[in-house]
Curated annotation (Swiss-Prot):
Forms a complex composed of PxpA, PxpB and PxpC. The keyword Nucleotide-binding applies. The lineage of its organism: Bacteria, Bacillati, Bacillota, Bacilli, Bacillales. SUPFAM superfamilies: Glycoside hydrolase/deacetylase. Catalyzes the cleavage of 5-oxoproline to form L-glutamate coupled to the hydrolysis of ATP to ADP and inorganic phosphate. Its EC number is 3.5.2.9. Coiled coil: none annotated. It comes from the Bacteria. The keyword ATP-binding applies. It catalyses: 5-oxo-L-proline + ATP + 2 H2O = L-glutamate + ADP + phosphate + H(+). One of its GO terms (biological process) is carbohydrate metabolic process. Belongs to the LamB/PxpA family. This is 5-oxoprolinase subunit A. One of its GO terms (molecular function) is ATP binding. It comes from Shouchella clausii (strain KSM-K16).
Length: 253
């Protein structure tokens, strides 16, 4: 593989609260997942983040989440597939309008947090979300956890998909991410994160917390924009990729 997408979750500030490192991380990524007001973000932050993405020629993506600002969208909420569909259509629509007003357009959609993790393991919810994306714009790329129900649902709906891997998270033997509540869920060393990503890209494998290797399809790499090491990770990772002849560009264009 000679090209890979680097994405980051951004636009997660709201009101008087500043979250993340959007301005500093934007030069190192190729696609931005912008919060749409439910788990984080607001109209002003969305507009500013779209403008920043356009300035850096970064692909604009909607990052719809559960309506849970207090929990940052990382707490499970029992929703039906129909509710999932409606939440996603609503949030894509909000960012679509803000992007269009500035001469931009949406490139992709990536669910956030608990919505992402719930749908990755729930085919009915994953299909509802994928259908929501398709019904808004069948040309949008659908980002989802590699090997999960999200990718299967995106393909079934007729969407282009981008299988996502994580630079700053560890993996379990079934290919799932280690729960944030578990020990060693996060990778805090930039060199370790870069080594994990390079192996996923070059060998299609990742070492799990159980000490085994599992196969993984890496088409887009996430660096969490709210992490303490986000900017250092992005700078280190982009440099390592380029040194190995791997171009950074938006996923599945």
């Amino acid at each position: 593989m000679n090209a890979i997408d680097l994405n980051s979750d951004v636009g997660e500030s709201y009101g008087a609260y500043t979250i993340g490192n959007d301005e500093k991380i934007m030069p190192y990524i190729s696609s931005a997942n912008i919060a749409c007001g439910f788990h984080a973000g607001d109209a002003h932050v969305m507009r500013e983040t779209v403008a920043r993405a356009l300035e850096h020629s970064v692909a604009i993506g909607a990052h719809p989440g559960l309506p849970d600002i207090g929990g940052f969208g990382r707490r499970n909420i029992d929703i039906s597939p129909q509710e999932g569909y409606e939440l996603v259509v609503y949030q894509i629509g909000a960012l679509w309008a803000i992007a269009k007003a500035q001469g931009g357009k949406l490139h992709h959609v990536k669910p956030h947090g608990a919505l992402y993790n719930m749908a990755a393991a729930d085919q009915a919810l994953a299909e509802a979300i994928a259908n929501a994306v398709y019904d808004v714009d069948p040309n949008l790329v659908f980002y989802g956890l590699a090997g999960s129900a999200l990718i299967a649902a995106g393909k079934k709906a007729g969407l282009k998909t981008a299988s996502e891997v994580f630079a700053d998270r560890t993996y379990q033997a079934d290919g799932s991410l280690t729960s944030r509540r578990a020990p060693n869920a996060l990778i805090t060393d930039a060199k370790e994160a870069s080594a994990q990503v390079l192996r996923m890209i070059q060998e299609g494998k990742v070492r799990t917390q159980q000490g085994t290797d599992v196969k993984i399809d890496a088409q887009t790499v996430c660096i969490h924009g709210d992490g303490a090491q986000a900017v250092a990770f992005a700078e280190q990772l982009k440099g390592e990729l380029e040194r190995h002849g791997i171009t950074v560009k938006a996923g599945n264009c």
